[in-house]
Each structure stands twice: as C-alpha cells, then as structure tokens.
A protein has these predicted regions:
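Single, function-defining residue in the core of a domain
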Residues: 1-173
C-alpha cells in the first residue's frame, strides 16, 4: 500500500463510477492491486492496469460478453448454461477467457454459492424488480447462483479459493 491519499474527487451522487475508472492509472506502481466493484468495470481500465504491471480484481458484470477465444468473431459464452453443462460438480470454476467485444484476456472465477445465499440474492433481486415494474428472467435467476470475478492475477499467485477471499477484503479496505 502507498499509505497516502492520492486523489480526492467529489461528484454528484448520481454520477456513474465508470467515468472515474481510469483515474487510478497514473498513480499505479508495479504489483499494485486494484480492487473494483461493478460500477468501475471498464475494459479499457483493465488493459491500462495490466500495462502498468499492476493487478486487478473485479466482479463480472452480467452484460459483459465472455468468450473462450480471442477471435472477435467467436461467439459469447452463455455462462449460466455452460457451467452446469461442462462443470456440473465443480464448486469453483477457473477459466482463461476473453471479455467484451475487444476480447480483453483475463481469468474468470465462478463460485457456486450455497443455496441459502442464492435464495437471498433472488429474493432481493425479485423485490428490486417488482419496485421497478420488471420481471426477472430465468437466466438472471441462474446468474445469481454464482459469484463471478475477473482478474489478471495468475493461478500460481492466487489459487482459485483465494480470489473470492481477497475480493471480500475490499469491504475492509473501504
């Protein structure tokens, strides 16, 4: 840790976090770790963090395309269909993937969540959808069965079970 305040920025509470996603790049040093929540997920920031020889860890946003191939023509993977079909008994799935239309390489980790956690996530999502006059798709309900993370930290540095633990530390840092 640098142990110093590098930047202070006040914004409208309704401003999107993505607009600030690149602000950290000039401050990065080799081997720094950038922990991000969904609001800061921008593919360009992931590229620039890696270009600085730094590390990133973020949750995966549902709308981001994921592919097993770097080819831009390769189809996006339907994760909620892929995992049960190809990894029916795995509690943690660890894959090298390419994300977004730009096919940014990264490591995807999917943790199957315990039933009680899945039920609570679905209950909250259903409540939120009702408030907005929407319905939850089955695909989104299935998505809520997993904790999904993307990182550029290799498996040799962080074994699969470590990634979720490190991400949870984010709340202790903030």
């Amino acid at each position: 840790m640098h142990h110093s305040l590098l930047e202070r920025y006040l914004s409208d509470g309704t401003a999107a976090d993505q607009g600030r996603a690149l602000a950290i790049v000039p401050h990065l040093r080799q081997d720094d770790l950038v922990l991000r929540d969904l609001g800061y997920l921008r593919l360009e920031s992931l590229r620039q963090i890696e270009a600085q020889d730094a590390w990133s860890l973020s949750r995966l946003s549902k709308g981001v395309d994921v592919s097993l191939e770097a080819d831009a023509q390769a189809p996006a993977l339907g994760l909620v269909e892929h995992f049960p079909r190809d990894y029916p008994d795995e509690s943690v799935i660890d894959l090298s993937v390419f994300i977004g239309h730009e096919r940014v390489p990264c490591r995807l980790l999917a943790y199957r969540l315990p039933d009680h956690v899945v039920q609570e996530r679905r209950r909250k999502a259903l409540e939120e959808a009702r408030k907005k006059g929407r319905k939850l798709s089955q695909e989104y309900r299935d998505w809520l069965s997993f904790g999904l993370y993307i990182t550029n930290v290799t498996q040799q540095v962080w074994p699969p079970k470590v990634v979720g633990t490190v991400y949870r530390l984010r709340w202790q840092v903030e």
